[in-house]
Amino acid sequence: MFSSFETLILSFVSLFFMMIFIHSKWISSYSKMAKNLPPSPFGLPIIGNLHQLGMTPYNSLRTLAHKYGSLMLIHLGSVPVIVASSAEAAQEIMKTHDQIFSTRPKMNIASIVSFDAKIVAFSPYGEHWRQSKSVYLLNLLSTKRVQSFRHVREDETNLMLDVIENSCGSEIDLSNMIMSLTNDVVCRIAYGRKYYEDWFKELMKEVMDVLGVFSVGNYVPSLSWIDRLSGLEGRAYKAAKQLDAFLEGVVKQHETKSNESMRDQDVVDILLETQREQASAGTPFHRDTLKALMQEMFIAGTDTTSTAIEWEISEVIKHPRVMKKLQQELDEIAQGRQRITEEDLEDTQHPYLEAILKESMRLHIPVPLLLPREATHDVKVMGYDIAAGTQVLINAWMIARDPTIWEDADEFKPERFLDTNIDYKGLNFELLPFGAGRRGCPGIQFAMSVNKLALANLVYKFDFKLPNGLRLEQLDMTDSTGITVRRKYPLLVIPTARF
């Protein structure tokens, strides 16, 4: 008779060899379905190429792409994934075959914390996605609607500038101030008020944290029990429950409000109005969908936007020549006024400010690997056979540093954008911070309005020094790790008022 320990060991050994067999059979069947596959690095049983991703997958995938080409096939566990690492490959996927690659793969943890993937970013391609994106484009993120929230952006930017002005000569954490700015702007626009409470900050941080944790079950379904054993799944369910309770409370508060003027309407008011209109038209707009869009406005409007602003001001501070040239342009725009407004920026040309925004987003794409897509049908990409169900990763970070496109690709040179029409709005596949095609970010105008106003005023109002006698050129620009790639270390500076 075997002891219980021996039985356990035999069970694990049997399971291991069974999974190797299943994995090899699956790889074999995939190869038979698609005869002309993209080049592929050798993978290990069960985990495939997961071990080769490291702490910075976008960088590891660049190393692999140098060997296997701009369109390669990897296996993340049992999931086949093609990785596009050139503008040409990205264009075939997001333009030529955009519809075939317009759905999202189901991600377990993301689904749990997003009302069963009801937010637009995670939603599979279909009627729900079309309806929700239409609400965004027509009701929440239209040019008229974005402009209607101008006073909120200017109010909160001015409050940040006041705090910095009162701290001149002292060390400040500019990273934290920028994060607070975007949080306050989005909370006022989305929910009608700011949330200073620690529980709110901790809840939103926990949601982002669980989204950034690697989920074994996404790639090796037979090992999904590891997500439960590690506590990840439990954390996700707990965060989802707390998030639902918070958003439900916000909705109920708004349902009891009296009619508001258009200037005073926030996103929740607009969504409730949309819900009533669609109910009258016989196209129900469900409660979970409403709360999912409320959640998405916060996540999409804060994390990536603050990351972008943080990198922009970091690069300008690190390069005094760029700072001086931008200040000269902004001085011309402001004409001696205390602050720069959105109207000032609309009524004047500011090519150098625009060039800095583009160059910073080229070097520091907030989300270096665009959210994964999935093929709904068999298709040929760059001459290779891609089977339905294959996932797609676009390495936007590698494309933005491609030396065949960008001279001195790893250096910060805003001047490169003064003589080119390349933009970040999804029409130029050399620069994809917001993605492109059907799954491109619908909130570009919203994000860039905050970006531009904040950067313009920070540079117009202040000069900056580094603490401890460091030269500006010594500013540490190390990346963090995660879905969103922020600065690894807070941006600590000493501001000085220019006037």
From Swiss-Prot:
A Gene Ontology biological process term: terpenoid biosynthetic process
Q: Does the keyword Membrane apply?
A: yes
Pfam families found in the cross-reference section = p450
EC number(s) in its UniProt entry? 1.14.14.-
Q: Which keywords are on file for this protein? A: Heme, Iron, Membrane, Metal-binding, Monooxygenase, Oxidoreductase, Signal-anchor, Transmembrane, Transmembrane helix
GO MF annotation, one: heme binding
Where it sits in the cell: the answer is: Membrane
- Keyword RNA-binding listed: no
Q: Any stretches that span the bilayer, and where are they?
A: 2-22
Q: How does it sit in the membrane?
A: Single-pass type II membrane protein
| Pathway named in the protein's UniProt entry | Secondary metabolite biosynthesis; terpenoid biosynthesis
> Could you tell me what reaction this enzyme catalyses?
(+)-costunolide + reduced [NADPH--hemoprotein reductase] + O2 = 3beta-hydroxycostunolide + oxidized [NADPH--hemoprotein reductase] + H2O + H(+); parthenolide + reduced [NADPH--hemoprotein reductase] + O2 = 3beta-hydroxyparthenolide + oxidized [NADPH--hemoprotein reductase] + H2O + H(+)
Under the heading InterPro entries, the entry gives: Cyt_P450 (IPR001128), Cyt_P450_CS (IPR017972), Cyt_P450_E_grp-I (IPR002401), Cyt_P450_sf (IPR036396)
Predominant place of localization: membrane
For the ligand (heme), the binding residues are 441
- One annotated Gene Ontology cellular component of this protein: membrane
* Cofactors required: heme
Tell me which family the UniProt entry assigns to this protein.
Answer: Belongs to the cytochrome P450 family.
- Report the function annotation for this chain: Involved in the biosynthesis of germacrene-derived sesquiterpene lactones. Component of the parthenolide biosynthetic pathway; parthenolide and conjugates are promising anti-cancer drugs highly active against colon cancer cells. Catalyzes the conversion of costunolide and parthenolide to 3-beta-hydroxycostunolide and 3-beta-hydroxyparthenolide, respectively.
User: PANTHER family in the record, alphabetically?
Assistant: CYTOCHROME P450, CYTOCHROME P450 FAMILY 71 PROTEIN
Which protein are we looking at?
3-beta-hydroxylase
Organism for this UniProt entry: Tanacetum parthenium (Feverfew)
